[in-house]
Amino acid sequence: MSRYRGPRLRITRRLGDLPGLTRKAAKRSYPPGQHGQARRKRSEYAIRLEEKQKLRFNYGVSERQLVRYVKKARAQEGSTGTNLLKLLESRLDNICFRLGFGPTVPGSRQLVNHGHVTVNGRVTDIASYQVKPGDVLAIREKKGSKQLAEGNLAFPGLSNIPPHLELDKAKLSAKCTGRCEREWVALEINELLVVEYYSRKV
C-alpha cells in the first residue's frame, strides 16, 4: 500500500485530529461519504484498524513500512506499543516537523528529500533516517533552505517542542538529547490497539 496523496481533510474527518498530516480542521464532525452521519456500532477489528490508520496517516508511512516498524518494536525490550511510537517519532521527517522546520510531516519530508537538512554536518535526504541521541540537525547554509525553514518556524504546526530536542532558532539547528517519551507524542492514539491489530498478521 503506497503513501496517501489524496484530500487530507477527508482523512481527518474519518480519523480525527492528525497534527502530522494537516494543520486544517475539518468543518464537519462526521465521517465523509453518503452514510457518514449514520450511527453504526463498530466491531473491535474496525476500532483497531482505525487506530492503525491514524499512525499511518499521521507519520506518513506505507503499510509495508509500518509492518517493519512493528517487527522492530517487538524485537526491542519494553512495551511494543511504546517502542513503536518512539521509532516513528525518531524519523527525520517527523523530527523536522516537531522542531517546526516543516509545517507538517509531508512538508518536512519534502524538506528532507530535497536536501535542505543536514545530520552531523552531512546532507541527509532520507526521511526515514532514525535520529539518535547526540545527533545534531541543521538547515543547510543556503539562502533557499534558510528561507523555507524560517518561514515555517514563524508558524509552527505544533506549539511545543518535546524536551528531548534542543532548538537553536538563530542557527537553525537542533540537538537530539534522548528519545521521545510517551507523554510527548502529539497524536491521540491507543498504540496497544495497533499492536493487537498486527498480532495475527505479523
UniProtKB/Swiss-Prot annotation:
Start and end residues of each stretch annotated as Disordered: 15-42
Role, per record: One of the primary rRNA binding proteins, it binds directly to 16S rRNA where it nucleates assembly of the body of the 30S subunit. With S5 and S12 plays an important role in translational accuracy.
NCBIfam families: PRK05327.1, rpsD_bact
Keyword Ribosomal protein attributed: yes
Database matches in HAMAP family: Ribosomal_uS4_B (MF_01306_B)
Protein name in the entry: Small ribosomal subunit protein uS4
UniProt family annotation: Belongs to the universal ribosomal protein uS4 family.
GO biological process: ribosomal small subunit biogenesis; translation
Subunit structure: Part of the 30S ribosomal subunit. Contacts protein S5. The interaction surface between S4 and S5 is involved in control of translational fidelity.
Domain S4 RNA-binding: 90-152
Highest taxon of source: Bacteria
Record's keyword annotation contains rRNA-binding: yes
GO molecular function (one): structural constituent of ribosome
CDD domains: S4
Annotated organism of origin: Synechococcus sp. (strain CC9902)
Keywords: Ribonucleoprotein, Ribosomal protein, RNA-binding, rRNA-binding
UniProt-listed SUPFAM superfamilies: Alpha-L RNA-binding motif (SSF55174)
GO CC, one annotated term: small ribosomal subunit
Pfam families given in the database record: Ribosomal_S4, S4
